[in-house]
């Protein structure tokens, strides 16, 4: 709704941004209701801004809206996934505090390190096979080798892990 102006609003117009986030949360809850009514099992909430802001700004402007949205989805009996593009490593901890059922991360996040953070909250981490360079342009063997290497880096692969493409 604001494009890149949202970044300036965090500094110049925080009250307006809070009211905008309240509005968009209500819209997101209504949209979630439509999806839930169709019978979805998991509802992904996608945010392109998280990787571009500080944890302080996330806490100030996004924590409450996301927490409310994930609580609403859970109350409706559906699982939620917090899907972020870009390197949101610095915000993984504050994202977990919004209590989604899963967090889907992009290919430029160290999945093994991310899983260590996210596991502290007993949240599932999802990601992050490179979609273009590995899956589209690579061979089947490239993909298999990538996954084996990734599994070798992750301490606990049998809990709270969904292997999938990143956001590309």
Regions found by a protein language model. Give the residues of each.
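Active-site loop segments of alpha/beta catalytic cores
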Residues: 1-168
